[in-house]
Structure formats: structure tokens, C-alpha cells
Amino acid sequence: LKEIKMGLGSKLFGTHSEHEIKRIMPLVKKIEGYHDDMQKLSDEELRGKTAEFKKRLSEGETLDDLLPEAYAVVREAGKRVLGMEHFEVQLIGGIILHQGRIAEMKTGEGKTLVSTLPAYLNALEGKGVHIVTVNDYLAKRDSEWMGKIHEFLGLTVGVVLNDMEKPERQEAYNCDITYITNNELGFDYLRDNMVVYEKDMVQRGLNFCIIDEVDSVLIDEARTPLIISGQSDKSTKLYEMCDVLANQMKRGDDLPEYSKIDAIMGIEQEENGDFIVNEKDKVVSLTQDGVKKVESFFHIDNLADPENLEIQHNVILALRANNLMHRDQDYVVKDGEILIVDSFTGRIMPGRRYSDGLHQAIEAKEHVEVKRESMTLADITFQNFFNKYEKKGGMTGTALTEEQEFRDIYGMDVVEIPTNRPVVRLDLNDAVYKTKKEKYKAVVDAVKEAHAKGQPVLVGTITIEVSELLSKMLSREGIQHNVLNAKYHEKEAAIVEEAGVHGAVTIATNMAGRGTDIKLDDDARAAGGLKIIGTERHESRRIDNQLRGRSGRQGDVGESQFYISLEDDLMRLFGSERLIGIFNSLGVPEGEQIQHKMLSSAIQKAQEKIESNNFAIRKNLLEYDQVMNEQRELIYEQRKRVLAGESMKDQIIEMIKDRIDYFVDQVASNEMDKSEWNLVELNRILLPVIPLSPITADSVAEIKKSTDLKDKLYEKAVALYDAKEKEFPNPEDFREVERVILLRVIDRKWMDEINDMDQLRQGIGLQAYGQRNPVDEYKMISYDMMDAMNDSIKNDTIQMLYRIRIEKKVEREEVAKVTGTNKDDSAKRGPVRRSAKKIYPNDPCPCGSGKKYKNCHGRMA
């Protein structure tokens, strides 16, 4: 009913997009009004407009004031330089991007050309514009292709690629317009916040970005954070042992859905085998038998003991590696290395490693060299990163299905832009078969039929494995074809461009080659245009629509159809068991297609279920990262001040005062009788940090109040600090020492904090049992941890500065070496464990409070 009302409402009043386009049309007419004037200008005069616009900005005009004329200038430049003039719909898209919104434009509508309009306009401010694409190939192609327009108009254009060194990156970021991938952009931001000298930073601020394929960047990839990792000192033997054990363990049957009624009735679920795999949530759990097997293998009494946490963690990792991570689907093995395959694009991601030991577990499984485990040095989610921009716009062919998420998380609305020519592609109903074997045979038959009449075919697969299987089947039939998957993405663009030629057959993994147009030749058009065959429904309707959208660009003919079997993951994991049971009992002859409207709705429901599930995962990730983000902002702000060369003396004197006040408050107060002041305890906690002479009853005989005691100790501490400074011939040398030490302490403590917060997040799930919201609990504890970190930074910084010796030249250095970056899509991230010394309840608390661990931060552990 709600949908009928919505449909009726939009018929009567028009959709949100139609309203917005109506409001933009007067601006479009203004731009078109400049057409003749622009044509009359010489190249030199057209180029001169850039300087004129900059002058007008400096005199108080705004970008909005300049927009109509500036867009007309870019339009004319496009015609002169590339022979491409922006259509009306592209001008609309350009205005929407400048407004910081998302333009939904169908494939082949020239999104790349659209971005030149807002990029030019916003670059006039001189603060830099980032054009974000999904891969290096597109960044390079677009910077060379569209960059010609900007360079013709006198702007500088740069591109940042994965293999570039620091000087090249700095140069590219200093250009007016920079083309770059989302991953490089995020990792450069994190690396900039790890440098020890300001001159080593590469970015110059986050002003305006235009995100191409915005759904892929802000939705698909937002489920996992960007992580920069360094090496931990943990042995790799345990991974190999756990892999041996995992291969001896027996997988139990999947547990049926556990309903609320079962829980109320207290019905226990029967487990068998040593472990159970939940493919839906990508989780592995041990059964009672499995726990016993692990205990006997490692000769331990109780796997649940805290000291056996590492064994438990590694056994689960080995089981995940062997049961949930599939070769040639999630990763490939090449030259003795495990390379991650991006599950959205099907591309190999060199240099990426799964975090939390999963990569090592896969290395052990595949019998290649197990590399040292990594620990997290810096991380951020795409949500929090892109929200740091002053303004952001995005383009994609498919965004409306996720409009709610764009609004809620990024504050961006989606405006659907009409196509330049109507879409005439024929989208056929899904062809459903009982088994995968029958389905693949039907796909090959469909390819043969189309190929016989010269119709080009693009077969979209979800995994490398399936693309290779179909390739073998087509070869057996003698059909010449190209395969496009993660293994060959160097040839990607060339193969995609050829995919529209008469008689061409192309198999592509997922959305490999997205961003490159498939152009039809005349014979292909006559044969019915590009035929798209999807070999499986994707988790997301949006990605299915992207595959369909490869055909029928700019009013071309074409058709699309998905082939599905009841054995596909989507149907197996999320389809209704009852429905599948019905079709199995119908006794459909082998190889025959099943058609039923119940099936279509089951497929759509399954996809909606997964989409809302994935939205929940992203929202949950963001809620946790928001807490981390507050800490991250404070730490990065502090680092920036140090790097900028500000004097830190006032801040350090403030730290000294804070510590003295804190230590005195632990042992004395104005309300207490002076005889009750615990001076022994004060010496014990204060002197290791500030090396004053011991405080005795005689030395404080004149003092009556604890506030006076604080003042006296502060006076002495400052005098001692000034004396330390005088040991250095040049005060500026000591200022640099302060910066070096503060930087080193901040970095080390922040690294520990990231890993501690990670562990906290893993353990916090258990709090839900106590009827408390895990995120609220996480917030409360993390604020305490942050206070403890700040106290610890103050203690360590002061302690080191009072004890520094002049003969040793102190240099800034990174506290840990970066060994890699990571994009882990296999599961929710686990804790990144540090092999630090174990703290026992009666040990002094490492926060420096002087209390026993059990009475201080141990309370929260």
C-alpha cells in the first residue's frame, strides 16, 4: 500500500529528482545563453577567462555567481580540444555535483565529461579539487583525456598512482585538479598523519572532491576501514600448527534457523562435528567436540583460559581460511604470495593484506611462506574520511536504491538525471535452473545462439573460478572469446572496448572494466546490440543493474538476462528453503528452465535482506568509528601543531602543572589534616616522573594547604625544567627536542590505543547479554581509555624531557615501520593483538596513576 501511495504521489506531484531538475533548468538556459559569445572568442581569449574569473573571485564574487559563464567556457573548451560538447543533461549533472550532491546518470551518458565542469569552477579558488575514481587505470586515463580541457584553460592537472614516490605525489596534490583513487587518497591522509617532518606531507587539505562511481566508493567499500599496518614480533609457527589441526577437524552440519519460540521453549540445538560454519555471517564456531580436540592437540586443560586466547583465535582463523576463504575467488596465489581479490571489482590488490592474522592463516593453508603478523598503525573508515571534505559530489549509474544511506551518513541527496536518448534495451526475466551444471550449459547455449547471428555477448560472473569454467566450456564448443578477470586487468580496457564488435564474446568478472565504454559497430547494432548475460544474481541489486547498464548506452539496442540456479549462494543462503523444496519436488526435467513469479519475488527479497544487512554492518562500523574519530582528530591536531614547528614549551609546562595537581590530589587535600598527607606515596608516584628532591615533612613544614603544596612543587619543577633547558647552548635546540619527544610519545601511545580499542570492540559484544547497548558501553570505556592515554602521554613526555642528555643528538623517527595497507572484506575485523607483557592484578597500572592495576584500569578489563 505504501508503495502504491508513493507511486501515486510521484505521478501527481513528480519525483524529488524532477523537482530539482526543474529548479536547475533556468541556470542551464543561462549557460546555453553564453554559447554564441564563447564561440566568437579566440583560444587566447577563452584561456584568459580563467584569470578573469580568479580576479572576480578575489573581488567578492562567489562560485555560484561565476557558474553560468564558467560552465560555458568549459563547454566551449571541450568542443575545441576534444571535439566533445556537453549535452544539456551533462550541464544539469555538472550543476548537481557543484551543489555537493549525487548525480545518477546511466552508463554511457558521459559522466567523465560532466566532472570537468565543477572541477574547473571549484579549482578557481586555488584550494585543489580531487577527482576520485575506482582504479589507477581510470585515474590515469581521465587525467590525460579530460585534463587536456583544464590545461587548455590554464589550470594544472596531476594524477596520483599506486607506485608513485613522495615527490611525485606532492607535485600531483599541488596541482589545481588531481585525479586519484579512493584508496590512495585515504592512505595518503593516514600516512600524512604519521610523518615526522611537515615537509614529508603530500596532501594540502581536503577541499572539494568529485567521486566517480560514488556507490562503489561510499557504499560497497565502506564496510571495511582503510588500515596501515606494521610488523609485530610474534612467531609464525602457531599459524602452521593451527592449519595442520584445522585439516584434521570435521565440519558439522549447518544449524537450522533458531527462532524466538525455540529460545523461549529452551530447545537446544543439536551440534555435530568439530566446528560449524555460518556462511551468511562469515563466522566459524567450535563445538564441544572441537574444543576437546584443540585442548588435546595443544596439551592444554582449558581453551577458555585467558592465556589460551591466542590459540583459540588462531584455530578459528585457520578454520576460516580453510572454509570461508576460497582460492581464485577471495584471493589468488602468485609467485609464492597470497594476493587479495577485490570482491566488488574482481581486481587483484597488490600490497594489500588481510588484518588480524587472517592473511597468515591463508599463507599456512596454501603452504607459502608465512609472513609476520601485522599490527595496526593507523586506520579510518571511508565514511569518516570523505566527511572531512568541505564539499563532495558524486556520480554513478546506480544510486537511488541506496539514497537513504547517502542522506543519513553523508548528507547527500540523489538526483536522477534523464538520459540524453531514451533507453531501448530489453531486460528479460531471470532464467532459473535447478542446478549450476544445467545453468552453465544454458548460458553456453545462449552464447552460441547469439554468436551464430553475430550479436556481441558480455557474460558477467561473480568469481574468477566461474569465468574460467565458462571459458573452458566455450573453448570446447569452438567459440572464440576474451576473458577479463583479476588476473589480466592490464589488458582490461582494450578488451572492454572490443566487446561491442560484431560477433565478440567477452567473459568479465563482476564489474571489471567498469568505466570504459562498450561501443557497438554497425553490424553489431543490426544483430540486436550487446547481449548481457549475468551468470548469478549479485548480493546487491545495484551491481546487477550496473551489469545490465553496460548495454543500451546512448539509445543503442541491446538485451540483458540473468541465469540463476537453486544452488547459487544467494538462493542457498538467503532464499526460502520452503520455496526451493517446492521446486525440487516438482520434478522438473533436467536442463529445463523453471519460471515462476514466486521465484522472482524470492530473489528480490533475498537481495533486499542482504542489502539491509550490509547497511546495518556499515552503520555499525560507523558508530564505532565515530568514537575513534574523536580521538583521531585530537591526536592528529596535536601532531599537526608539533609538525608546524610551534613551540611546545607552554604545552609542556601545562603538562607539568597538570601532573603535579593530579599526584598531590591522590595523597592530600585542603580538607584533610596535614598529618594525614601521605608524603611517602607522593614521592613514589611523583619522583619517577619529575625528578625533584624527595619531599619530607621538614621541606613542607611551612605549608598548610594542599593548594600551596601544589604551587611550591610547580615552582621547583619549572626551575628544574629551565635548568635542563640551559644545558643546551641554543634554546631552539631544546625546542626541537621537545617536539621530537612529544611526537614519539604520541605516536607510540596512539598505536597502542588503536590496538587496545580494537580488542575492546571485540570483547564488547558480550556486554549485550547484560542488557546494555554495546556501542554505549564502548563509548564509556573508550573515554576512560582516552583519559588514561592522555595521562600516559603527559607522564612519558615529561619523564623523558627531564632526563634527556645533551651529548646525544635527538632525531625525529617513526615509531614503527609501515609494512602494508589493507582492505579486508572477508569478515568483521578482529582484534589486532599485541604481544605485550601481561599485566597482573597487583602490578602498578601502566597508565602511571601509581594505583594497582586491579584498582585502576584493571577494573574495566
PLM regions with names:
Residues 459, 507, 750, 786, ...:
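Hydrophobic, well-ordered secondary-structure elements that form the walls
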Residues 837-854, 858:
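Short Cys/His-rich zinc-binding micro-motifs
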